[in-house]
């Protein structure tokens, strides 16, 4: 079942369908993976070279039948799709211990490649027409899509740790480091529409998916292919991230421990493409410098009981797909999805207070409360686009989330199941997202946020 609803009808106290479909999907996936890791120990130094490769191919055929209530038509739809995903990541790293383990230096060089291809995606829609009581389905604008995406990224990191032997009761540790990453994306897509000539339309009214794309049907009196590729169907983008941090682990005796630090990040995003109309060029160049402090304080009441207080600030940067103006048709949603070049980064302030109980080795009981404040949270929203559905992304004003969480880990030795444990995690979350004055959106729960989460095993 694949249903979509219009706004709730308060007068009739009922939901109204936008569409109501029955979907059937056939899918086959093949995977190929390779892993190669190499390490070398030399004195107080350790070197590692890690490689990971994955290739995944998926072939799928989707068939749909139902009613589009917005256009008041019965429809049938087919999608044939092959997707190929390739990922590779390689990392060369080293770790060096200096001065009797009082100092440690580690570094990393990395490269990653990712590719996604849809070499020939076919979509066919048929609309029902009734004449003199005779119902027939007429093929409407069969379409073929081709798209190719490539990501290349390089990264480097350097970290240093120094231990201070001030006294037996006070042994602070200083950590500092830098990080850099550069990522570049190239995206190209093409779109072709099969147009039926007037003289041959009725003859091919009830074509099905298996025959409509046959090369034998391409002729001057039947079907011709028309390219409908837009300038917005291709874009290039890159982002640069530079970061530095300093942190300290502090302890006062055996009861009080604290981890404090701050991380500075410089981020630059560039995008070259066109708006969805294919006329107006888009040249995006954004940069920002942010600071992210963090504090984690733990107080040991005794060997089995501990109270922990934590605070941290984080960022949720918009992904490429959330920014680019490329319009992608999602068959499952029966809707177009496009990005928003005006999207802002979202920031979160996180606070956490927990009580921790350790009844036995390997066992824990933790209960706590948390609060999160989000500024400019990114959410997917509906936008008007004629008779079809279209979604994009936008920033809400702010959002809050708070709740309680319970964690339990219990060994099962007492019932004869040695080596096995029972684990439980449950949370209640209340969230609310707020929109600026004048917005068509109403304040509501955060998108995709469930009020209850339970994991056990």
Give residue spans per PLM region.
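Signature of Gram-negative outer-membrane beta-barrel scaffolds
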Residues: 12, 16-25, 143, 147, ...
């Amino acid at each position: 079942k694949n249903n979509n609803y219009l706004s709730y009808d308060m007068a009739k106290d009922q939901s109204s369908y936008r569409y109501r479909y029955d979907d059937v999907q056939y899918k086959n996936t093949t995977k190929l993976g390779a892993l190669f890791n190499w390490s070398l120990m030399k004195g107080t130094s350790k070197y590692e070279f890690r490689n990971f490769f994955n290739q995944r191919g998926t072939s799928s055929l989707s068939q749909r039948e139902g009613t589009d209530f917005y256009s008041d038509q019965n429809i049938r739809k087919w999608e044939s799709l092959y997707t190929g995903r390739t990922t590779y990541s390689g990392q060369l790293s080293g770790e060096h211990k200096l001065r009797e383990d009082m100092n440690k230096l580690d570094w990393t060089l990395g490269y990653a490649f990712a590719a996604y291809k849809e070499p020939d995606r076919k979509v066919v829609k048929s609309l029902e027409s009734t004449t003199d009581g005779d119902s027939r389905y007429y093929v409407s604008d069969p379409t073929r899509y081709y798209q190719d995406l490539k990501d290349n990224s390089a990264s480097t990191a350097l970290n240093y740790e120094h231990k201070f032997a001030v006294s037996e009761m006070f042994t602070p540790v200083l950590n500092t480091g830098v990080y850099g990453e550069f990522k570049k994306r190239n995206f190209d897509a093409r779109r072709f529409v099969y147009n039926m000539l007037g003289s041959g339309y009725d003859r091919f009214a009830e074509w099905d998916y298996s025959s409509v794309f046959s090369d034998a049907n391409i002729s001057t009196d039947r079907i011709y292919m028309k390219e409908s590729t837009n300038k917005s169907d291709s874009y290039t983008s890159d982002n640069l991230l530079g970061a530095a941090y300093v942190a300290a682990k502090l302890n006062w005796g055996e009861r009080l421990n604290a981890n404090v630090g701050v991380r500075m990040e410089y981020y630059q995003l560039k995008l070259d493409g066109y708006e969805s109309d294919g006329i107006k060029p888009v040249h995006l160049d954004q940069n920002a410098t942010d600071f992210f402090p963090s504090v984690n304080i733990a107080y040991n009441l005794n060997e089995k009981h501990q109270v922990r207080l934590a605070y941290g600030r984080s960022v949720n940067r918009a992904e490429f797909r959330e920014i680019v103006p490329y319009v992608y048709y999602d068959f499952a949603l029966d809707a177009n999805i496009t990005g928003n070049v005006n999207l802002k980064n979202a920031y979160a302030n996180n606070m956490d207070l927990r009580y921790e109980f350790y009844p036995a080795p390997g066992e824990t009981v933790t209960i706590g409360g948390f609060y999160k404040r989000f500024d400019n949270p990114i959410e997917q929203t509906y936008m008007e686009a004629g008779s079809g559905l279209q979604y994009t992304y936008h920033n809400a004003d702010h959002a809050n989330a708070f709740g309680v969480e319970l964690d339990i880990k219990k060994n099962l030795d007492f019932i004869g199941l040695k080596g096995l444990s029972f684990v439980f995690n449950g949370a209640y979350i209340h969230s609310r997202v707020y929109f600026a004055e004048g917005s068509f959106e109403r304040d509501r729960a955060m998108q995709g946020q469930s009020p209850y989460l339970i994991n056990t095993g």
